[in-house]
UniProtKB/Swiss-Prot annotation:
Protein's recorded name: Transcriptional regulatory protein RCO1
Chain positions with Phosphoserine modification: 68, 683
Subcellular location(s) per record: Nucleus
Chief location: nucleus
Gene3D superfamilies: Zinc/RING finger domain, C3HC4 (zinc finger)
Length: 684
């Protein structure tokens, strides 16, 4: 039995422990005190890989190094602390005393590493970092977030009780009350409170809504707005194309997502209140009612749409039931009951015109942020456009701020831009406010680079003409011009055709200020449309038929006016003859004959018995003149007293010729020729 004990005590590990390296260490201390022998070695760890054995030589070397360092430090004289700024008697700064450099022995309390060294390779390894895993249990780095360890996140249980006595919120509890100024009728006002009152307390405690989280998956074909954002920033187009998927988490684990960096109501940037359920963000003043940024709601905040989805639990039956109850309870506003019900279930949105109104005019368009813009608005150039060579410029960041270029060398005054009437000099603290300014090589008018239209952009290495000048020399073609001018005009026109191909020139047929008599030549426009209705309420060009109808309508009205005047003239003439006949005592038959002679057209029944081709035209109108009418106008009372004698054949021929001549002329010219006043003028 004794031999077995000896064998167990003399194990290989024990024999190794009494190696020469360890014996030298024990021999130095054996003179002072002898080491007692061990009777058993059952609870001793003999794994030498975890031990650090220090020899006697190593102890002596480390001891000498420590004493040598102390001796050197003792010999260094201590310097007196100096002030940071040394000043003379007048108060001027003479010297700046920089603080002493940090010693290599100083360490960071958090990492335990010196300040002059970077992190070690062990810290750089991602395998040693703490990650939060996703739902599937996978450890993809793209879907993980760094989470501190539990020893740093532990909070004492009585932490709130310790600091609760120091709070002073009880002083303002009686002063602050919830405002009812912006309260509106809706599903979240009366319906929710009434339904909660009807629920028993046991069901209310057991009812737990599952956390609804949102995951955004960006499509690969998302387009980015390069004009509004640069260098990979989030844009509205990229996030609007993202497909949202709402799902329920069975394990109650959270999935982090990034909220939008623009307001969902007005599409503008600024400070937001982010929804904890969906990625939407809102300005504090864009919400209905607005929220005070100093008194934000505690806990998780949800937008109106998410609140409504959580309340109805994504059930259409619940939605219809609540909507019907709301309509029954609000009979006084039955017409707008559905509208009032849907007001609180939608997020506030800035008013925008419909697309068919926005796209009516070709020069008007909607900006990147939904604002109004037309051809008069100048789009500012971005940094990528300014500092690249796409527009023939070679600008660098070093040229972005140079105060000398903003001052006129001759007068010493600031150069003021012709377009914006500003200098935009910038400052040393804010050089980004500076804008490059240049002067015209012909009129010395200053222009900012971003104020110049793109059609007149300056190219380095050549003289530049500002937009105030005409682009080319135009020769006016005059009819009565010399040969050299006409040749110059032809040469200029030929050069223009050579320089710019496929360019059409339209020469007007009439000059400016030409007075025409209403004879306007209109080129008909043919439209190849297969449908008659107007799509999207677009404004079309003026149709050719509308001009024709207006022209015919004006002619018809003018003809009616002429007929009305002629009728009034004849009516006044007949009235005058009737009055003269009644004064002279003529019978009614004579008066009828006198009046019949004044009719301009008379039905001729002479051709009824004729057998020629014109026999069918029995009721032809023929212009007749009666000299009795003229004599009655000239001498109204002497017509009956005239005695008619027999005339010879020659006199009758002359009278017939005279009658033909008189009948060939109209009445107005004949009365004017005979110097007889018009009866119409006499009536007036």
């Amino acid at each position: 039995m004794d031999t077995s004990k000896k064998d167990t005590t003399r194990s290989p590990s024990h024999s190794n422990s009494s190696s020469p390296s360890s014996s030298s260490l024990s021999s130095s201390s054996s003179k002072e005190k002898k080491r007692p022998k061990r009777l058993s070695s059952q609870n001793v760890n003999y794994d030498l890989k975890r031990r650090k054995i220090i020899t006697s030589e190593g102890i002596e070397r480390s001891f000498k190094n420590e004493h040598s360092n102390l001796a050197v430090e003792d010999n260094i004289p201590e310097e007196e602390p100096k002030e940071l700024l040394e000043k003379d008697s007048k108060g001027n700064i003479i010297k700046l005393n920089e603080p002493s450099t940090i010693s290599e022995d100083s360490k960071v309390s958090v990492t335990g590493l010196p300040l002059n060294k970077g992190p070690s390779e062990k810290i750089k390894r991602e395998s040693l970092w703490n990650y939060r895993k996703n739902l599937g249990g996978q450890s993809n780095n793209s879907e993980m977030t760094l989470v501190p360890s539990k020893r740093f996140t532990q909070v004492p249980k009585n932490f709130q009780d310790l600091n609760r006595n120091d709070l002073k919120t009880f002083l303002t509890e009686n002063m602050t009350e919830e405002s009812n100024i912006r309260s509106t009728i809706g599903w979240n006002g009366d319906i929710i409170n009434r339904t909660r009152d009807r629920e028993p307390e046991s069901d209310r405690d057991n009812k737990k809504l599952s956390n609804i989280r949102t995951k955004i998956i960006l499509s690969t074909n998302a387009t980015y707005d390069s004009k509004s954002k640069l260098f990979g920033q989030n844009s509205i187009k990229s996030t609007s194309n993202a497909s949202e998927k709402i799902f329920r988490d069975k394990n109650n684990s959270t999935i982090d997502f990034e909220n939008e960096d623009f307001c969902s109501a007005c599409n503008q940037s600024g400070s937001f209140l982010c929804c904890d359920t969906c990625p939407k963000s809102f300005h504090f003043l864009c919400l209905d009612p607005p929220i005070d940024p100093n008194n934000l709601p505690k806990g998780d905040w949800h937008c109106n749409e998410c609140k409504f989805k959580i309340f109805i639990n994504n059930s259409m039956a619940t939605l219809k039931k609540i909507e019907s109850n709301f309509i029954k309870q609000n009979n006084n506003v039955k017409i707008f009951a559905k509208l009032l019900f849907n007001i609180d279930s939608h997020n506030p949105k800035q008013f925008q015109l419909p697309n068919y109104i926005k796209e009516t005019f070709p020069a008007v368009k909607t900006g990147s942020r939904g604002q109004y813009s037309d051809e008069n608005d100048k789009i500012p150039l971005t940094d990528r456009q300014l500092f690249n060579t796409s527009y023939g410029q070679s600008i660098t960041k070093l040229d972005s701020y140079n105060p000398d270029t903003h001052i006129d060398s001759n007068s010493g005054k600031f150069l003021i831009c012709y377009k914006c009437n500003q200098t935009r000099l910038g400052s040393w603290s804010h050089p980004e406010n500076s804008r490059l300014i240049m002067t015209c090589d012909y009129c010395q008018t200053p222009w900012h680079l971003d104020c110049v239209p793109r059609a007149s952009f300056k190219n380095l290495g050549s003289k530049w003409k500002c937009p105030l000048h005409s682009p080319t020399k135009v020769y006016k073609k005059i009819h009565h011009c010399q040969e050299d001018n006409s040749v110059n005009y032809k040469v200029w026109k030929k050069q223009r055709l050579i320089n710019k191909k496929n360019q059409l020139y339209y020469e007007p047929l009439q000059k400016i200020g030409y007075q025409n008599n209403g004879n306007i030549q209109i080129i008909p426009t043919t439209s190849h449309t297969d449908y008659d209705f107007n799509q999207d309420f677009k404004i079309t060009q003026i149709d050719e038929n509308s001009i024709k109808y207006d022209f015919f309508d004006k002619i018809y009205k003018s003809k009616m006016v002429q007929k009305r005047k002629l009728f009034q003239f004849q009516e006044s003439l007949i009235d005058k003859l009737v009055s003269n006949g009644s004064q002279n005592g003529n019978s009614e038959d004579n008066m009828v004959k006198d009046i019949a002679s004044l009719i301009y057209f008379q039905v001729s029944n002479n051709d009824k018995s004729s057998n020629n081709k014109s026999a069918s035209k029995s009721n032809n109108l023929r212009k007749l003149w009666d000299l009795k009418e003229l004599t009655n106008v000239v001498v109204p009372n002497e017509l009956d007293s005239i005695q008619f004698n027999d005339f010879s054949s020659d006199e009758i021929k002359h009278l017939l010729y005279l009658k033909k001549i008189i009948e060939s002329k109209p009445k107005e010219e004949l009365l004017k020729f005979l110097n007889i006043e018009n009866p119409e003028n006499q009536s007036e």
